[in-house]
């Protein structure tokens, strides 16, 4: 099964994008107007929003983790607000990585909770206030840029360098969550992750709008176990090709790949199929940290499968060594100005 985003979204506009243009115009009018006119409620903590222009994977999770680590290194106590995509909690919930499963809270919150307290709620203000009651002094909003349900002191929009914003059309004709011009007006800075020229257009738009542009790479953090081996790599994330490339960067030979939908809930037949395919070709099985979190909390996954499954985690590294600290400083300074202004 492929990603939830239709493949044509990431190609040049074709007849499908043209046929869906009227629906996209309506969607864009509504989403753009909501974004521009919104006056989100505020909390008495500095808030950094890590979002993206499109649906699908761009690198928000490793970016949020990098900022959580950076805040901790400065002596701060960050908390992360998330909607918990893929989970089924409808109220306020503090993620417990030792007991919660991905089916209940989502895979990304489980990963994030390894680094900072994560509060799930459709009411982002309530989640932020709850984290404040736990002693958190810095809020990272995982996604939520377009919903405008919590004021952000700084909105960092993440884009994948190879895919960019796809065909540049709004849902359902393309992957944009709202018209790019409307989103750019509310963007404080752009973070381009990886190598490639797919994001050249959005980078030019950000430059014309006077927005700072940062660059970063995803570096494999466990290369020693990957290098020199032949792999069947599988992933259920927004942009699986990025993961396969990371395996190659870590020195692994990717012989076979198998892509599932983003946040995919694996079935026993899926696991048997992967094991059989790997066994026939003498390959090791490797997946992402996000997929491993889902698999490890599913009741039907055999322990022996998990014990043999390799996991490639990645860390975000800014090209400019002072970039992360500069953004954190800006968030705090804007919060202080808001508080005393």
Curated annotation (Swiss-Prot):
UniProt KW GTP-binding keyword: no
UniProt enzyme class: transferase
Highest rank taxon of the organism: Bacteria
SUPFAM superfamilies registered for this protein in UniProt: P-loop containing nucleoside triphosphate hydrolases
InterPro entries, sorted: LpxK, P-loop_NTPase
Chemical reaction(s) catalysed: a lipid A disaccharide + ATP = a lipid IVA + ADP + H(+)
Keyword Kinase: yes
GO molecular function: ATP binding; tetraacyldisaccharide 4'-kinase activity
GO cellular component, one term: plasma membrane
Residues noted as binding ATP in the record, renumbered to the chain: 54-61
Pfam families per UniProt: LpxK
EC number: 2.7.1.130
Pathway(s) served: Glycolipid biosynthesis; lipid IV(A) biosynthesis; lipid IV(A) from (3R)-3-hydroxytetradecanoyl-[acyl-carrier-protein] and UDP-N-acetyl-alpha-D-glucosamine: step 6/6
GO biological process annotation, one example: lipopolysaccharide core region biosynthetic process
Keywords (A to Z) from UniProt: ATP-binding, Kinase, Lipid A biosynthesis, Lipid biosynthesis, Lipid metabolism, Nucleotide-binding, Transferase
PANTHER family: TETRAACYLDISACCHARIDE 4'-KINASE, TETRAACYLDISACCHARIDE 4'-KINASE, MITOCHONDRIAL-RELATED
Entry's family note: Belongs to the LpxK family.
Its job: Transfers the gamma-phosphate of ATP to the 4'-position of a tetraacyldisaccharide 1-phosphate intermediate (termed DS-1-P) to form tetraacyldisaccharide 1,4'-bis-phosphate (lipid IVA).
Alphabetized HAMAP family for the sequence: LpxK
Protein name: Tetraacyldisaccharide 4'-kinase
The organism of origin for this protein: Brucella ovis (strain ATCC 25840 / 63/290 / NCTC 10512)
Organism placement in taxonomy: Bacteria, Pseudomonadati, Pseudomonadota, Alphaproteobacteria, Hyphomicrobiales
């Amino acid at each position: 099964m492929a990603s939830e985003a239709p493949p044509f979204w990431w190609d040049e506009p074709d007849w499908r994008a043209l046929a869906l243009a009227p629906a996209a115009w309506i969607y864009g009018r509504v989403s753009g107007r909501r974004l521009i006119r919104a006056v989100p409620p505020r909390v008495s903590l500095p808030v950094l929003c890590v979002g993206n222009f499109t649906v699908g994977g761009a690198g928000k999770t490793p970016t949020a983790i990098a900022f959580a680590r950076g805040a901790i290194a400065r002596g701060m106590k960050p908390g992360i607000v998330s909607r918990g995509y893929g989970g089924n909690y409808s109220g306020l919930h503090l993620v417990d990585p030792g007991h919660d499963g991905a089916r209940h809270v989502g895979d990304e919150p489980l990963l994030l909770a390894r680094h900072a307290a994560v509060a799930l709620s459709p009411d982002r203000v309530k989640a932020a206030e709850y984290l404040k009651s736990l002693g958190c002094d810095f809020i990272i909003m995982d996604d939520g840029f377009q919903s405008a349900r919590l004021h952000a002191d700084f909105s960092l929009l993440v884009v994948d360098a190879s895919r960019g914003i796809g065909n540049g059309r709004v849902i359902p004709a393309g992957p944009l969550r709202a018209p790019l011009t409307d989103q750019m007006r509310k963007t404080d800075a752009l973070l381009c992750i990886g190598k490639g020229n797919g994001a050249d257009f959005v980078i030019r738009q950000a430059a014309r709008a006077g927005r700072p542009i940062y660059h970063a790479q995803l570096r494999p953090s466990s290369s020693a176990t990957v290098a020199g081996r032949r792999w069947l790599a599988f992933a259920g994330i927004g942009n699986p090709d990025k993961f396969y490339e990371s395996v190659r960067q870590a020195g692994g030979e990717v012989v076979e790949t198998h892509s599932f939908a983003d946040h995919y809930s694996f079935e026993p037949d899926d696991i048997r199929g992967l094991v059989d395919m790997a066994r026939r070709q003498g390959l090791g099985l490797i997946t992402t940290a996000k997929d491993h979190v889902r698999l490890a909390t599913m009741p039907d996954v055999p322990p022996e499968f998990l014990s043999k499954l390799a996991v490639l985690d990645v860390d975000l590294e800014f090209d400019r060594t002072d970039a992360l600290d500069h953004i954190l400083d800006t968030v705090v300074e804007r919060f202080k100005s808001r508080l005393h202004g």
